[in-house]
Each structure stands twice: as C-alpha cells, then as structure tokens.
C-alpha cells in the first residue's frame, strides 16, 4: 500500500478525440477528491481547452489543473519525448507535496499512442461505441497493452448500430488477460469499477 512517503501514483489516460477522456477525468476527480489529494495535467496541441473544461466543470480547484500545450504530434509528448509532461509533474509535486494521484490526460490520439513508462505508472485507454464496433479488433498498443481499456458510451449502441457483444468478444480476444470495462462514464456506469481498478492496481488500498 502506498503511503505519503511514496511518490504519487501517475495515471495516464489516453484515447481518440471524443472518446470521453475529459469526461472520465471529471467524474474521477469528483468521485475521488474527498478521499485522495489529486492533481491533473492535460495535453492539447495548441490550446488548453481540456484544462478549461475541467476547471469550468469544477472537477478540482483551478490551481490543481495544469494545461500543457504540446504543439505538433500529441503522441510525442507522452512517449518519445515526455520531458514537457515530466516537468509539469515535477512542478505539481512541488506545489502539492502531499499529492496522492497525478492524472495525465493525453491529447486526442490514435490507436498507436502509448505512455512512456517513466511518465505513467498505470495507463487507461478510452474508446467509444460511437467510433464503431470494429475499434477493439483493430488493435494497437492502446487497446492491447494499456492496463485498463474502457469501452465508453455503451448507451449509444442502439443509435449507432454497434453490437456490444461483438465489441466485448473482440476486446477479450485482443487483450487476453488484461482487464476492460464497458460502460458510460457520463452516466456513472462503470465509474466505480474504474476507481476500484486504480485503487487496487495503484496500491492505494491494502
């Protein structure tokens, strides 16, 4: 179990544009902030829009949400050259020395994006049903190697013609023993399971 003497748990959240990463972050912060000391680092290419959205939503106090403008390719800032994010992590740790969890949201990326091990202790990859039922079987590191895959917006399946059983079957084939969760985080469906995963895999509970 982690204690205050341990470094904070760093949780990377990735996924394509519109999959629900920022909504998941908002819901996680609101559900976990009473129990844990939290900060968030968001990545956008040319703006700090996700930082603004989380601040307006009241996810955390504004000073606990830092926006990073990556420029160029968003994958590079979380993988090949994570220095800009590592610097942000260091700044947040100095500002909030008792922080328990640092959430790091990647910019909208494709299925090939992954977090550098030096940046993230746990990775959560978010895809959504509206992207099509074929997404899980397309694979890519985010789907096959993330610590947790979240198949989001299951409530939209009837409206986009996606088969949830097919998506579930494909996710099992692509991930093997690695866990995945199907739900709709905006509605709270699956949120408790995601929190439980973070707590158990991040050694936040004994």
From Swiss-Prot:
NCBIfam families assigned to the protein according to its UniProt record, in alphabetical order: ureG
Family annotation (Pfam families): cobW
Protein known as: Urease accessory protein UreG
GO molecular function: ATP hydrolysis activity; GTP binding; GTPase activity; nickel cation binding
Domain of life the protein comes from: Bacteria
Keywords recorded for this protein, A-Z: Chaperone, Cytoplasm, GTP-binding, Nickel insertion, Nucleotide-binding
Gene Ontology biological process terms in this record: urea catabolic process
Binding site for GTP: 15-22
GO cellular component: cytoplasm
Entry function: Facilitates the functional incorporation of the urease nickel metallocenter. This process requires GTP hydrolysis, probably effectuated by UreG.
Family: Belongs to the SIMIBI class G3E GTPase family. UreG subfamily.
Gene: ureG
Cellular localisation: Cytoplasm
Organism: Polynucleobacter asymbioticus (strain DSM 18221 / CIP 109841 / QLW-P1DMWA-1) (Polynucleobacter necessarius subsp. asymbioticus)
Disulfide cysteine pairs (residue numbers): none
Lineage: Bacteria, Pseudomonadati, Pseudomonadota, Betaproteobacteria, Burkholderiales
Subunit structure: Homodimer. UreD, UreF and UreG form a complex that acts as a GTP-hydrolysis-dependent molecular chaperone, activating the urease apoprotein by helping to assemble the nickel containing metallocenter of UreC. The UreE protein probably delivers the nickel.
Gene3D superfamilies the record matches: P-loop containing nucleotide triphosphate hydrolases
